[in-house]
């Protein structure tokens, strides 16, 4: 079950220039975004742990994105 709501993802695709978006396209984009977010979050958690913290910060996310 998807964690991200479909409507905002549909709006993002339309904001990128699409006039029409199929439900399958939105579902696939949600899947891709969730997979990417989980990957980044896991890296950020490891960075926080390595720094001796339990709290993930915005800097951890930025660093995870640059890896």
UniProtKB/Swiss-Prot annotation:
* Keyword Cytoplasm included in the entry's annotation: yes
Complex and partners: Homodimer or heterodimer with another histone. Dimers then assemble into higher oligomers, with the DNA wrapped around the protein core.
* Family membership: Belongs to the archaeal histone HMF family.
Q: Know the name of this protein?
A: Probable archaeal histone A1-2
Cellular component, GO annotation: chromosome; cytoplasm
InterPro entries reported for this sequence:
Archaeal_histone_HMF, CBFA_NFYB_domain, Histone-fold, HmfB-like
Database matches in Pfam families: CBFD_NFYB_HMF
Q: What is its main location?
A: cytoplasm
Enumerate the SUPFAM superfamilies for this protein: Histone-fold (SSF47113)
Where is this protein localized, as stated in its record? Cytoplasm; Chromosome
Give any GO molecular function from the UniProt entry: DNA binding
Protein task: Binds and compact DNA (95 to 150 base pairs) to form nucleosome-like structures that contain positive DNA supercoils. Increases the resistance of DNA to thermal denaturation (in vitro).
Origin organism is Archaeoglobus fulgidus (strain ATCC 49558 / DSM 4304 / JCM 9628 / NBRC 100126 / VC-16)
Q: Which Gene3D superfamilies match?
A: Histone, subunit A (1.10.20.10)
What PANTHER family does the record tag this protein with? Answer: ARCHAEAL HISTONE A
Q: Which UniProt keywords apply?
A: Chromosome, Cytoplasm, DNA-binding
């Amino acid at each position: 079950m998807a964690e991200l709501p479909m409507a905002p993802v549909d709006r993002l695709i339309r904001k990128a220039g699409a006039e029409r978006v199929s439900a399958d396209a939105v579902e696939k984009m949600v899947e891709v975004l969730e997979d990417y977010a989980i990957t980044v979050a896991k890296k950020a958690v490891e960075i926080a742990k390595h720094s001796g913290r339990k709290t993930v910060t915005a800097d951890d996310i930025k660093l995870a994105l640059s890896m």
